[in-house]
Amino acid sequence: MKIIAKLLAATTAIGMATGAYAADMTLKFGHVGNPGSLFEASVDNFAACVNGAMGDAVEVQTFGSSQLGKDKELLQKLKLGQVDFSLPSSVMSSVDDTFGIFEMPYIIKDRDHMRRVQAAMMDKFQAAANDNGYHIVGLAENGFRHITNNVRPITLPADLEGVKLRTPNGVWRLKMFQEYGANPTHMAFSDVF
């Protein structure tokens, strides 16, 4: 199985700890995860940490299940300042190929390996994000890749031959499934399931 790392992008620099903000501030954090997902758990944990550390000065409000938009819409809203934070799915590989590393099959062996890759690549990720108008606040994981379908069990890449499946937007993921002989249809992550 492959571990997918998700990138946490934000348009605003996190200068919230400075005294420049005398008034209360509310920040919106949108994501596409459903209730109970790792998306929700990660975002809720981030909000709890910030809210706890900042007291009444800052409140991070979370909006899951694509309430503020799907992945691409959230990225646009980040640039427009309509959303302060987003936890995108694999859509970041559409922004810059650098982010496609986490869509490549079977190159991440386990969580420790993933952490080493993230640490080694963080400067490249941040540069790619900055070049496209984003700032990475942190990285989050979304578990192991699973392939579900109603045709047959998938235990080898060859088992995908002729299988129609839905996949989140992501250049490399789409290419991978096509190379394995599947017929993937890409769509927003929140529409896949």
Where are these regions (language model features)?
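Bacterial N-terminal signal peptides that target proteins for export
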Residues: 1-8
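Bacterial N-terminal signal peptides
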Residues: 9-15
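Sec/Tat signal peptide C-region and signal peptidase I cleavage site
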Residues: 16-22
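Extracytoplasmic "Venus flytrap"
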Residues: 28-45, 64-69
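Residue-level recognition of beta-strand->loop/alpha-helix junctions
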Residues: 31, 62-64, 89, 188
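Extracytoplasmic small-molecule ligand-binding "clamshell" domains
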Residues: 45, 52-53, 59-84, 108-110
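Contiguous mixed-secondary-structure segments that line small-molecule binding/active-site clefts
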Residues: 47-48, 79, 84, 89-189
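Short, hydrophobic alpha-helical packing/hinge segments within bilobed ligand-binding/sensory domains
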Residues: 71-75, 173, 192-193
